[in-house]
């Protein structure tokens, strides 16, 4: 049983260490140029339509959560009277 565990450990170690790394193109310089451009556009919109959608969804969720928290605080501050 111990021999099987050692063999399993060797196999797992071998597959992890011998996997080839994926090489991706470095897009950081392109993104830096895009976001550092002085074109009067807000940074949160320079990424395109997906960034605008993400920003709007974040703002909507934030406002909704704030309104809900205020509502719950008001309900806790003014409880219903018991008859």
From Swiss-Prot:
Pfam families: COX7a. Residues 1-23 form a transit peptide. Residues 24-48 are mitochondrial matrix. GO terms for cellular component: mitochondrial inner membrane; mitochondrion; respiratory chain complex IV. The keyword Transmembrane helix applies. Signal peptide: none annotated. One of its GO terms (molecular function) is oxidoreductase activity. Pathway: Energy metabolism; oxidative phosphorylation. It is found in: Mitochondrion inner membrane. It comes from the Eukaryota. Gene3D superfamilies: Cytochrome c oxidase, subunit VIIa (4.10.91.10). Residues 78-83 are mitochondrial intermembrane. The modification N6-acetyllysine is found at residue 33. It is a single-pass membrane protein. The chain crosses the membrane at residues 49-77. The keyword Transit peptide applies. Keywords: Acetylation, Membrane, Mitochondrion, Mitochondrion inner membrane, Oxidoreductase, Transit peptide, Transmembrane, Transmembrane helix. GO terms for biological process: mitochondrial electron transport, cytochrome c to oxygen. Component of the cytochrome c oxidase (complex IV, CIV), a multisubunit enzyme composed of 14 subunits. The complex is composed of a catalytic core of 3 subunits MT-CO1, MT-CO2 and MT-CO3, encoded in the mitochondrial DNA, and 11 supernumerary subunits COX4I, COX5A, COX5B, COX6A, COX6B, COX6C, COX7A, COX7B, COX7C, COX8 and NDUFA4, which are encoded in the nuclear genome. Belongs to the cytochrome c oxidase VIIa family. Component of the cytochrome c oxidase, the last enzyme in the mitochondrial electron transport chain which drives oxidative phosphorylation. The respiratory chain contains 3 multisubunit complexes succinate dehydrogenase (complex II, CII), ubiquinol-cytochrome c oxidoreductase (cytochrome b-c1 complex, complex III, CIII) and cytochrome c oxidase (complex IV, CIV), that cooperate to transfer electrons derived from NADH and succinate to molecular oxygen, creating an electrochemical gradient over the inner membrane that drives transmembrane transport and the ATP synthase. This is Cytochrome c oxidase subunit 7A2, mitochondrial.
């Amino acid at each position: 049983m111990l021999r099987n565990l050692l063999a399993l450990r060797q196999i797992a170690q071998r597959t992890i260490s011998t996997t080839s790394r994926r090489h991706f193109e470095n897009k950081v310089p392109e993104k830096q140029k895009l976001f550092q451009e002085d074109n009067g556009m807000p940074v949160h919109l320079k990424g395109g339509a997906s960034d605008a959608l993400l920003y709007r969804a974040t703002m909507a969720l934030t406002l909704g959560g704030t309104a809900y928290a205020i509502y719950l605080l008001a309900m806790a501050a003014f409880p219903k009277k018991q008859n």
